[in-house]
């Protein structure tokens, strides 16, 4: 079984100084790995490493990516992903007439100003299309504000806004829930996978 978890390729963006966040990835109430983000001015470096067992079989997910940004527009991307043996390599950069993205040696010209699923930048909530950094798919998305919700962050209860992003991809439907605090800082995520819900929890 191949488990495509599109959220693993997603980033914060547009932070003005070097910072680091580390999330635990929780699947069926068990920590299965970590996803770290390092932010240096207009650059985001993302690393994920997950390993879990299902039906007595081991599954592995590894992802490394570097994105650069000009405000809310992606300037370049370079990512490599091993989704339990399915390998993806994505590169892309702004060119004269758009954003040229190449995924596993197949190139596509996209609009010049695009965004990935950069959850740390709430501007994604205003988009109609987003690019999946894992495989380069440029997806139609539907974004909804579901309402306010209490959220436990590092042991403390805070009031958040809960958003939903849905999309259809070549690998099936995507349904992602995002929690933002009242300063619009991203604090949590949930997405459905074939074997259960996965959560991102800040360490």
What kind of feature is each model-predicted range?
Residues 97-115:
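Acidic/charged, solvent-exposed loop-and-adjacent secondary-structure segments enriched in E/D, K/R, S/T
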């Amino acid at each position: 079984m191949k488990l495509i978890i599109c959220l693993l390729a997603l980033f914060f963006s547009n932070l003005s100084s070097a910072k680091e966040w580390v999330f635990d990835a929780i699947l069926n109430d068990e920590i299965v790995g970590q996803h770290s983000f390092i932010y240096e001015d207009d650059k985001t470096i993302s690393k994920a490493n997950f390993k879990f067992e299902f039906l007595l079989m081991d599954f592995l997910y590894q992802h490394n990516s570097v994105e650069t940004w000009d405000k809310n527009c992606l300037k370049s991307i370079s990512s490599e992903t091993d989704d339990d043996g399915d390998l993806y390599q994505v590169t892309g950069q702004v060119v004269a007439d758009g954003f040229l993205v190449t995924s596993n040696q197949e190139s596509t010209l996209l609009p010049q100003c695009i965004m990935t699923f950069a959850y740390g930048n709430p501007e994604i909530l205003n988009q109609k299309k987003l690019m999946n950094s894992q495989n380069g798919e440029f997806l139609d998305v539907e974004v909804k504000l579901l309402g306010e919700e209490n959220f436990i962050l590092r042991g403390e209860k805070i009031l958040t806004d809960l958003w939903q992003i849905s999309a259809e991809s070549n690998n099936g439907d995507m349904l992602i829930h995002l929690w933002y605090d009242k300063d619009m800082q991203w604090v949590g995520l949930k997405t459905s996978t074939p074997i259960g819900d996965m959560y991102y929890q800040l360490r």
